Amino acid sequence: MNAPDLTRPPLTIRRISLDTGRENVAVISRRSRALRPEVFRGFSRVELRINSKVLLATLMITDDDAMIGPDEVGLSEPAFRRFNEPVGSAVSVTPARSPASLDAVRAKIQGHTLSAAEITAIVDDLAHFRYSDMEIAAFLISAARFTTTDELLALVGAMASVGTKLTWDTPIVVDKHCIGGIPGNRTTMIVVPIVAAHGLMIPKTSSRAITSPAGTADTMELLARVDLDVEQMKQVVHACGGCLVWGGHVNLSPADDILISVERPLSLDTPEQMVASIMSKKLAAGSTRLLIDFPVGPSAKVTSANEAMRLRKLFEFVGDHFGISVEVVTTDGRQPIGRGIGPVLEARDVMAVLGNKPGAPADLREKSLRLAAHLLEYDPKLRGGTGYARAKELLDSGAALKKMQQIIDAQGPSPCPAELGSYAADVLAAADGVVNGIDCLRINRLARSAGAPVAKGAGIDLFKKIGDRVEKGEPLYRVYASDRSEFDLALAAAQAESGFAINHHTPADVDLVS
Amino acid sequence: MNAPDLTRPPLTIRRISLDTGRENVAVISRRSRALRPEVFRGFSRVELRINSKVLLATLMITDDDAMIGPDEVGLSEPAFRRFNEPVGSAVSVTPARSPASLDAVRAKIQGHTLSAAEITAIVDDLAHFRYSDMEIAAFLISAARFTTTDELLALVGAMASVGTKLTWDTPIVVDKHCIGGIPGNRTTMIVVPIVAAHGLMIPKTSSRAITSPAGTADTMELLARVDLDVEQMKQVVHACGGCLVWGGHVNLSPADDILISVERPLSLDTPEQMVASIMSKKLAAGSTRLLIDFPVGPSAKVTSANEAMRLRKLFEFVGDHFGISVEVVTTDGRQPIGRGIGPVLEARDVMAVLGNKPGAPADLREKSLRLAAHLLEYDPKLRGGTGYARAKELLDSGAALKKMQQIIDAQGPSPCPAELGSYAADVLAAADGVVNGIDCLRINRLARSAGAPVAKGAGIDLFKKIGDRVEKGEPLYRVYASDRSEFDLALAAAQAESGFAINHHTPADVDLVS
């Protein structure tokens, strides 16, 4: 009795210019020939079917025949793209039941643990857009309450198995990942060319900024094209031994992208979800050696050594299970790395380090060298303990810069002009003293409100870092924006609260990479 | 820095014929003058503001100027209605942050208990449509995991306080509620006229069917108008001492309606949420004496005496706290009550009982009398133990029927024709034996697939009940439908699995009302 009602006439597909993000949306007329719209309300779910092809969508109802007539069903942009059938095709539209895997989610809500088969079914339905927003939220929140280690392993395995699975013809495929939160922390763009110049394979995919003023992909985009598909990425890696591309077109762990799109608005952030997200992507990417950077600081994502330890163990446990050698380093996350925050400014810092320019940010150089050193030690041919010296040699000799240029050429020319925002003003110290702290969250927010990362030239250029002595009225940093109203807002906010703590203590020294 | 960006030009409101149900939806152009749509994705949240009036909405983006131009913002039907500003009004549109109360939801997800103030803030935001679907799901699921008794009391109080709060000029205001799940269980339409005929006040609001083939409001609608607003309802109660109206226009506990709209698609159903839903509505309705009917049976909502006990204690606890005298009766929920299932058939049964017609269903009559007896005992002037006799007297004498007629006249004429579906066929016994069980879930589904409650004349008319002897080929029930394809589907499903268990045991006897 739950079979589709095939005796009703099919509707013809029409495309509606509505970008509804992740959610599939279908529109029918209140006088539809194929459905009794009285039984529907807005945001019910319907099933569209052509032969064996099925799409689940959230329903909206219109009274406007110009939008959708009684014989039509309208598909929003993402639904139209995913269903991939031409306008005018005949499609059956029936009420949809929830995906069967939702029973497991309900059990999880009640406190049961899930089997690997149940988790695999959930991830499969997620990745194929069969869950509504609410249903995704239901899964995430039930899992946020508790996730057993067995559940976590099943989740990582299932997430890595849907979507692209890359394999490489060498046993040592290195990768690095930073859990984020630190402005200006663009070490990846220095580490990748060093490691590739040495001869280890490092096929790096990165994200665009989600809540920060720049991601590696946003910054790299100023130097080269980053929206490569899988085949194009493989060509670059085979030619250069490494790449710096955006993960968006490579489709590694698509379920993760979907989960993140709900975690973000709900600000859900549990260790297990972080580990599942990162490890599923690395597993799908074919990485075998992974270095993870945990910045620790009062305004970083990880605020204490205990928290870092727990998270490290979780990464190691999952890595061991899947045959990925995971190494976690805790780094100084008390302040931004480098000087620039925002894509253009960060690209400037990266190229200054790679080019051994005078005035290149020493902390960005030093951190990148230390991370690269860890990765180079994965090379069995390198004598133990010489990774740092080798990294420094590759950077100082210009080999890393040359490799970066090769990667840029292979990926293709950047589509973006690398211009700084035309509005700029300095934010000044309110008193004499020593910089004792820089609030990373605050600096991130200021750079975002100035327009970064959408406005590539917007952001913040730091003149002072922790330990620097400042005089009242001396500039702390410069705010850049490309848009007048964003500039006014960001500057006013920075002047109200700069994010700098200035007093007369001398800050404690912290080792950069543990 | 999170202040609205007032330096951007406002947009003008346009109305879009899209019924998006509970969710507020706003549409802007990808080339919008007031927003940088690049920073948005579909299903981001935006804040619309005119002076101090604010609406939160989920955003969709269009490339079609004919739908929404760069100077416009489109509001879906519910958003337009709720914002209540004319087409063409200038409105500022800015990115919306989540409601502040969502921090408490996040704490709850992490396992914290919430204060009364936090719960009140959540309910206030819910009732004012400030939560997205996902956010509502987040709250429900965090609460489904555990809800303390203090949290439950705070929830009931907060839910009852938003929306209409009815007060009556008498200390004894009786009410009844059935937790549902039993087909044909239309006792309310018999109990209300008996109790009102006696002289106790019983201002009854009922729901339409959500997952069953008929609600009291759907059935009553065949006899009288039910979509009364608060003032009209009060007039009926003052004139008749009781009413039988749909709760939808009375706006008791609007937060409950919103929670239910998410609980339903997720099939969330915890004791605490059931208690919060029912008790908040009764408190808002001004009820002081409440009788709750728990049908217990293998396919009922409550399947065991232990479960019934736990739920009863929870209702009593909340009732005591808010000064509502709650009495719970467990009733026989092993099979449907009466013969008809579906609005027209159920209205027929109700009127047969009220009219003392020969052949009126004895079980529906008996159960209604027993429930009415419990309610009549709330009258201090009635001698203890005489409630049943008094109820029977009011029914047998025709006083209850007369009262029903008075209520019908006061509420106004029914807008619906009371015609049975024109397609009908009998479902036959597959073997000789005795009816040992009737699956309530199955019967509900069959009646729904036949078209009930939307098709008022669709449903099932039972010829056999538990304990009846049947011969192979004898009709068990008749399926009615108004639509050919629904008829075919329902009949095929019924023939595949009738919902009747027939064997050679004699079923155990169960007392009707405990």
From Swiss-Prot, chains A, B:
Kindly list the GO CC terms recorded for this protein. cytosol
Tell me which UniProt keywords the record has, alphabetically.
Glycosyltransferase, Transferase
Q: Does the keyword Transferase apply?
A: yes
State the superkingdom.
Answer: Bacteria
Cite the PROSITE patterns for this sequence.
Answer: THYMID_PHOSPHORYLASE (PS00647)
Family to which this protein belongs: Belongs to the thymidine/pyrimidine-nucleoside phosphorylase family. Type 2 subfamily.
Gene Ontology biological process: pyrimidine nucleobase metabolic process; pyrimidine nucleoside metabolic process
> Which catalytic reaction applies to this protein?
thymidine + phosphate = 2-deoxy-alpha-D-ribose 1-phosphate + thymine
Which EC number(s) does the record attach to this protein?
2.4.2.4
Q: Which HAMAP family match?
A: Thymid_phosp_2
User: What is the source species?
Assistant: Rhodopseudomonas palustris (strain TIE-1)
Q: Which GO terms describe its molecular function?
A: 1,4-alpha-oligoglucan phosphorylase activity; thymidine phosphorylase activity
Q: Which SUPFAM superfamilies match?
A: Nucleoside phosphorylase/phosphoribosyltransferase catalytic domain, Nucleoside phosphorylase/phosphoribosyltransferase N-terminal domain, Pyrimidine nucleoside phosphorylase C-terminal domain
* Classification via InterPro entries: Glycosyl_Trfase_fam3, Glycosyl_Trfase_fam3_N_dom, Glycosyl_Trfase_fam3_N_dom_sf, Nuc_phospho_transferase, PYNP-like_C_sf, PYNP_C, Pyrmidine_PPase_CS, Thym_Pase_Put
EC top class, in one word?
transferase
Matching Gene3D superfamilies, A to Z?
1.20.970.50, Nucleoside phosphorylase/phosphoribosyltransferase catalytic domain (3.40.1030.10), Pyrimidine nucleoside phosphorylase-like, C-terminal domain (3.90.1170.30)
Please report the name of this protein according to its UniProt entry. Answer: Putative thymidine phosphorylase
